[in-house]
From Swiss-Prot:
Binding site for S-adenosyl-L-methionine: 29-40, 69, 90, 152
Organism superkingdom: Eukaryota
Cross-referenced InterPro entries: SAM-dependent_MTases_sf, Thiopurine_S-MeTrfase, TPMT
Reactions catalysed, as given in the entry: S-adenosyl-L-methionine + a thiopurine = S-adenosyl-L-homocysteine + a thiopurine S-methylether
Leader sequence residues: none
Residues recorded as bearing N6-acetyllysine in the entry: K58
Lineage of producing organism: Eukaryota, Metazoa, Chordata, Craniata, Vertebrata
Subcellular localization(s) per the UniProt record: Cytoplasm
Entry annotated with the keyword Chloroplast: no
Protein name stated in the entry: Thiopurine S-methyltransferase
UniProt family annotation: Belongs to the class I-like SAM-binding methyltransferase superfamily. TPMT family.
Length: 245
């Protein structure tokens, strides 16, 4: 879309009622993977991340990069190939195994002692570790702190009632001087229940504003044919860079 004024003027809906009580269970997310309903996965990686990669990495080497609700994001391999250390968390064991298989990476797995039934999958190279567990259980495990967080398909997937808890966990994982790249979606939430959920600017300020500088890097029209089935006629992706205040 070339009409930047249209993107700038995307209507903001009050995020108080429409999707407030919407809840997806962990089992429902697992079923999406089993049923192949993973339209959120991007086989070619995220184009806005590619475009703003230098801004995100800032020329630094050997960074620790966290991927919340990572799925089988191909960007994890990108960062690992650049010498960074990648840690992700994902509820679907199938998604994690598919990542290693599709990226032709050998790996090992071991139980996470602090979380019954949970596992961690580690690449043989040692710089990719994916935790298969509920993200909200993650504070029970010492996974260290991170220089970078790539939040695409995570905040927009968390049940709206859990956002504050989610944000607290994310910020607790950041190191001094962190850079947090956040992708969210704007559409008419009265027409689609989510997920992905609608996250307005005001919500981002409410969640992150007290501890982070918030800068919107770009807004792009990402409407595709498949979105018509959601009952919407537009969808805009916004990319934010959050930095330490």
């Amino acid at each position: 879309m070339d009409d930047t004024s249209t993107l700038t003027d995307v209507k903001e809906y009050p995020d108080t009622e429409v999707q407030k009580n919407r809840v997806l269970t962990l089992e429902e997310w697992r079923e999406k993977w089993v049923d192949g309903k993973i339209g959120f996965h991007q086989e070619q990686g995220h184009q806005l991340l590619k475009k703003h990669l230098d801004t995100f990495l800032k020329g630094e080497n050997v960074l620790r990069v966290f991927f919340p609700l990572c799925g089988k994001a191909v960007e994890m391999k990108w960062f690992a190939d650049r010498g960074h250390c990648v840690v992700g968390v994902e509820i679907s064991e199938l998604g994690i195994r598919e990542f290693f298989t599709e990226q032709n990476l050998s790996y090992s797995e071991e139980p996470i002692m602090e979380i019954p039934g949970a596992k961690v999958f580690k690449s043989s190279s040692g710089n990719i570790s994916l935790y298969c567990c509920n993200l909200f259980d993650l504070p029970r495990v010492n996974i260290g702190k991170f220089d970078r967080i790539w939040d695409r398909g995570a905040l927009v997937a968390v049940n709206p009632g859990d956002r504050k808890c989610y944000t607290d966990i994310m910020l607790s994982l950041t190191r001094k001087g962190f850079r947090y790249l956040l992708a969210v979606l704007s559409y008419d939430p009265t027409k689609h229940p989510g997920p992905p959920f609608y996250v307005p600017d005001a919500e981002i300020k409410n969640l992150f504003g007290s501890t982070c500088n918030i800068h919107c890097l770009e807004k792009v029209d990402v409407f595709e044919e498949r979105h018509k089935s959601w009952g919407i006629d537009y969808i805009v992706e916004k990319l934010y860079l959050l930095t330490e205040k």
